[in-house]
């Protein structure tokens, strides 16, 4: 009988190293990730595949993988129908609307108003076509000018949307380099904002925050064997995440100072106390 395996997609790129550290901390030994997209893992019931985080939500949705780690931004961008199991609390970035530093707009609405009121087109470069299109289409200023018309989404292969005055252009990277020649503004993720500043851009408005997220295929969760295995992985990750929030402090204290110390030490219920061999000490 063929051995069953849980198919686990992990992200390449900026999330990769922290993901490997999480797996290691959860007692999964991963080998070959630096030279193969199919690294080995110490759990024989799991198979790993390294993929771009942009791809993982749809592959998990379609059952090509049972679980995956990706950014919550890409779950939203793809609209994938997956079960979000847990925020893994690393890879935190902000998705922001940014414009040239010479523009002092304080909101997306103000930026749109200043251009549209002068009859100027709006060109936005981004990897996040759907999030950007929704954000712009729902903006009150945009709706006042164009109602229900959809912004034009532009890629090398297709154009969708009715409104050519507001174009959202697919970026294949180096998005911060697009303004002012190819774009009037961008939507991109940033951790510190330094790269934007170095390219003479400033943040106009934050759209969302994103972090690494564990997701699962909904059908896989209905399979008893896969569900149990997925919950095992989730439990191991949860243990690592919770342990990172806490400190283990070991100290010796005289018996007469014990109650005073207990009054200030935190714990899940109470600190663990052991009496030492020496009289009057813990």
Q: Each predicted region: which residue ranges?
A:
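Short, structured active-site "lid" loops
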Residues: 45-65
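Small-molecule-sensing regulatory modules
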Residues: 1-50, 69-83, 87-92, 103-109, ...
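Glycine/small-residue-rich phosphate/adenosyl-binding loop
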Residues: 98-100
């Amino acid at each position: 009988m063929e051995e069953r395996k849980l198919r686990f997609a992990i992200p390449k790129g900026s999330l990769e190293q922290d993901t490997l550290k999480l797996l290691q901390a959860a007692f999964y030994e991963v080998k070959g990730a630096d030279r193969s997209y199919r690294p080995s893992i110490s759990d024989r019931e799991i198979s790993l595949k390294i993929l771009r985080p942009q791809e993982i939500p749809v592959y998990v949705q379609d059952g090509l993988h049972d679980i995956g780690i990706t950014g919550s931004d890409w779950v939203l961008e793809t609209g994938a129908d997956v079960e979000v199991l847990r925020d893994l609390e690393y890879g935190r970035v902000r998705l922001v609307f940014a414009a040239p530093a010479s523009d002092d707009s304080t909101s997306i609405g103000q930026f749109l108003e200043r251009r549209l009121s002068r009859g100027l087109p709006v060109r936005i470069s981004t990897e996040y076509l759907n999030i950007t299109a929704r954000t712009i289409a729902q903006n009150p200023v945009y709706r006042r000018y164009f109602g229900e018309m959809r912004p034009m989404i532009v890629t090398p292969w297709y154009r969708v949307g009715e409104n050519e005055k507001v174009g959202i252009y697919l970026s294949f990277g180096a998005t911060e380099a697009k303004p002012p020649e190819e774009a009037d503004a961008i939507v991109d993720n940033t951790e510190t904002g330094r790269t934007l500043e170095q390219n003479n851009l400033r943040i106009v408005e934050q759209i969302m925050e994103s972090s690494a997220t564990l997701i699962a295929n909904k059908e896989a969760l209905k399979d008893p064997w896969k569900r149990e295995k997925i919950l095992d992985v989730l439990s191991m990750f949860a243990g690592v995440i919770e342990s990172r929030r806490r400190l283990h402090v070991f100290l010796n204290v005289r018996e007469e100072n014990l109650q005073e110390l207990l009054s200030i030490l935190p714990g899940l219920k109470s600190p663990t106390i052991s009496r030492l061999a020496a009289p009057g000490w813990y």
